[in-house]
C-alpha cells in the first residue's frame, strides 16, 4: 500500500504555503505558523489526509472507477499528463473548458469531432484537401487535442477528480460539486477548502511537491486496478470449478 512519510514531504517542500497576506482564513486549522512572511502548513494533518485520500482513490480504482486528473497551470501541466498516463486514467492539463462536466453532451460531440479529424489525418483525407483546408483542419485537430485529448477515451463522466490547486481549478471543482462527483484536492493556504471532499493541505506550486503527490496518487490507483484484476481472476477460477 502506498503511503507518504513526513520526511518525504519536508524534502519536497510540501509545508511551504503562500505569503501570509494572501491566506484564506478557512485554512487556519491546517496552518502551523509563519516564517519570514510565509505560512507553514502543519504536515501532521497533510500526512494523515493525503494517506486517507490515497486509500480512497485505491478503492475507487479497484471498483473500476474513472479518475480525472486536473492541473492546468504551467507548473502542473506536464506532470499531470504523465501521472494520468502512468495509471491509465484521464486528465485535463491545458485549459478547463466551462461545462466540461456539466455539459457533457456537448463535450461528447467535440470529442467525436476530434476522433473524426484524427482518422482523417491518418487515412489520407488531409492529403486530398487544398493546402489551406488541410491547414485549417490540422489547427482544429491540435486545438481539440490540447483541450480534450486527455478525456477523449473517458466514455462518460468520471467517478472522482484529483486536483492540483483548488483555487486555480475552482470552475472544475464547482462543476464536480454540482454533479455530486467527489473532489480530492491539494489545497494551499491561499485556497478555499469548501467544496473539497478530500482536502490535502499542501504546497501546490513547487514542482517537487506536485510530483510527490502525483506519483503517490498514480501508484495508489494502479494498486487498486491490480486488486481488481486479482479479484476477477479469483472469481473466474471459482466459476470454472
From Swiss-Prot:
Pfam families linked to this entry: Ribosomal_S2
Keyword annotations: Ribonucleoprotein, Ribosomal protein
InterPro entries noted in UniProt: Ribosomal_uS2 (IPR001865), Ribosomal_uS2_bac/mit/plastid (IPR005706), Ribosomal_uS2_CS (IPR018130), Ribosomal_uS2_flav_dom_sf (IPR023591)
GO MF assignments: structural constituent of ribosome
Listed GO biological process terms: translation
Gene Ontology cellular-component terms listed: cytosolic small ribosomal subunit
Gene3D superfamilies linked: Glucose-6-phosphate isomerase like protein, domain 1, Helix hairpin bin
Similarity annotation: Belongs to the universal ribosomal protein uS2 family.
Protein known as: Small ribosomal subunit protein uS2
Species whose genome carries this gene: Hamiltonella defensa subsp. Acyrthosiphon pisum (strain 5AT)
Amino acid at each position: 500500500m502506498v503511503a507518504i512519510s513526513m520526511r518525504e514531504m519536508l524534502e519536497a517542500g510540501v509545508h511551504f504555503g503562500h505569503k501570509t497576506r494572501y491566506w484564506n482564513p478557512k485554512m487556519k486549522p491546517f496552518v502551523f505558523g509563519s516564517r519570514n512572511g510565509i505560512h507553514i502548513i502543519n504536515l501532521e494533518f497533510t500526512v494523515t489526509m493525503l494517506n486517507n485520500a490515497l486509500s480512497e482513490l485505491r478503492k475507487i480504482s479497484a471498483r473500476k472507477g474513472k479518475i480525472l486528473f486536473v492541473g492546468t497551470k504551467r507548473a502542473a501541466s506536464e506532470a499531470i499528463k504523465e501521472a494520468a498516463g502512468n495509471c491509465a486514467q484521464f486528465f485535463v492539463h491545458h485549459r478547463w473548458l466551462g461545462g466540461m462536466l456539466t455539459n457533457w453532451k456537448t463535450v461528447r460531440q467535440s470529442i467525436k469531432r476530434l476522433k473524426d479529424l484524427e482518422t482523417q489525418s491518418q487515412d489520407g483525407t488531409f492529403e486530398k484537401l487544398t493546402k489551406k483546408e488541410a491547414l485549417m483542419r490540422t489547427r482544429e485537430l491540435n486545438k481539440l487535442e490540447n483541450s480534450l485529448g486527455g478525456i477523449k477515451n473517458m466514455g462518460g463522466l468520471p467517478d472522482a477528480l484529483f486536483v492540483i490547486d483548488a483555487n486555480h481549478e475552482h470552475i472544475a471543482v464547482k462543476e464536480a460539486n454540482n454533479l455530486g462527483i467527489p473532489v480530492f484536492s491539494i489545497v494551499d493556504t491561499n485556497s478555499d477548502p469548501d467544496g473539497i471532499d478530500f482536502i490535502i493541505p499542501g504546497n501546490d506550486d513547487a514542482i517537487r511537491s506536485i510530483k510527490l503527490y502525483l506519483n503517490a496518487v498514480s501508484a495508489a490507483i494502479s494498486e487498486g486496478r491490480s486488486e481488481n484484476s486479482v479479484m476477477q481472476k479469483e472469481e473466474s477460477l471459482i466459476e470454472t470449478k
